[in-house]
């Protein structure tokens, strides 16, 4: 259990309610952020403790979502903020309640449990090391050694390909050749490994785009790999996103079916920032500005990185209003959805 949160609650006891509602954690000290986290948790806990508070919270979020200034929305939803702060102080000293849910969490039921051999066990260890990203060259070399030991293991080749990709992404210029070669070996070992086909399509996209290739036959091969990946798992967001992006990289107009693929991908991983941003800007390009802005306003209230969300909202508003926006924010370069969902 995170016992240190009890200290955070005490340390944050003198944090004003205005700081919880309107403060920017990214501008706080480490101790300040920790205190903010604990007191903000308590605040949310209190706002979910009674039907009246729940209704106030709902009203506040709805008004902020409509673009009403946060302080005005807070006063209209909660009333006197001084009284709200006193209520929070009293709540801290009370016995906190919890609610036992009778409905289980939603999860995929098609779970397969497999006993791992020596190679599989080592692969899990190296996969986690790659995700940590502390020493990618050393992890890549260890994966190459494992691949030499088990040359016919498609999963090992796929993980080696991802390590090569991660290293290439951090290099200038980027050379995804070694990653693509490892993906070829993975596909040769197991032609039904959907993720290998999906990442192969992505590597091909990068290469063809860099080389300025517009040969329809080459881009058909890209989408052939995507189709194979999609057939293996129609609920995997990665092939859906790759299909959408293939038209962007080729420089072609995005067809309706690709817009639909991106929408489905987002519905599968709404928690992923990169996918959310991609989908929001695709909606904006279709002049669905209000929906696009609502999607990004979610990020503008992210306690860990609200500034990027605010810049993205400003960019979308500029697109809607037909005015230039020069401070174009960089999209996240990489996120966990590359491993579980998206390209």
Where are these regions (language model features)?
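Structural marker of alpha-solenoid helical repeat scaffolds
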Residues: 149, 189, 232, 267-268, ...
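Alpha-helical protein-protein interaction scaffolds
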Residues: 280-281
